[in-house]
């Protein structure tokens, strides 16, 4: 388990106010920041810190998997979009979300319009 600490008191003055990540499984300490004596990302044995007092510092783990999900919400009926394909003159202001931006439905090609309808209205996931 990894724990973040800020050293508040130590025999070694270089450790004072420094921030470390302690890995209890490897018995190692990684320097996050120190005013002198240690470099950022320097890894030492936890025992090399000697005696010290510290306070816990909250750390946030980076996500292990990059990416995520994106959701475009269009509150429409299928019939409305299908009618807009058949009668675009009746829907000059119909705006939808596509790939994170707003677009007029009539400015899309017929193929793109059909794709939007197919992706927006599905029977199941």
From Swiss-Prot:
Which source organism does the UniProt entry give?
Vibrio atlanticus (strain LGP32)
The Glycine radical domain sits at 5-125
InterPro entries xrefs: Auton_GlycylRad_Cofactor (IPR050244), Form_AcTrfase_GR_CS (IPR019777), Gly_radical (IPR001150), Glycyl_radical_cofactor_GrcA (IPR011140)
Keyword Lyase assigned: no
Report the residues modified as Glycine radical: 100
For this UniProt record, the keywords arranged alphabetically read as follows:
Organic radical
What gene name is listed for this protein?
grcA
Question: What lineage, starting at the top, does this entry show?
Answer: Bacteria, Pseudomonadati, Pseudomonadota, Gammaproteobacteria, Vibrionales
The name of this protein is Autonomous glycyl radical cofactor
Q: One short Pfam family name for this protein?
A: Gly_radical
List, alphabetically, the PANTHER family matched: FORMATE ACETYLTRANSFERASE (PTHR30191), FORMATE ACETYLTRANSFERASE 1 (PTHR30191:SF0)
Any one GO CC term of this protein is: cytosol
Q: What does this protein do?
A: Acts as a radical domain for damaged PFL and possibly other radical proteins.
């Amino acid at each position: 388990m990894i724990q973040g600490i800020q050293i508040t008191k130590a025999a070694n003055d270089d450790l004072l106010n420094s921030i470390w990540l302690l890995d209890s499984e490897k018995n190692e300490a990684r320097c996050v920041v120190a005013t002198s004596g240690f470099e950022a990302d320097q890894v030492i044995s936890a025992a090399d810190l000697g005696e010290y007092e510290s306070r816990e510092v909250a750390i946030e783990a980076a996500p292990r998997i990059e990416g995520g999900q994106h959701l475009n919400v269009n509150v429409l009926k299928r019939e409305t979009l299908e009618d807009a394909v058949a009668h675009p003159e009746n829907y000059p202001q119909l705006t939808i979300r596509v790939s994170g931006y707003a677009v007029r439905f009539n400015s899309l090609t017929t193929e793109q319009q059909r794709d939007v309808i197919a992706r927006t209205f599905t029977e199941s996931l």
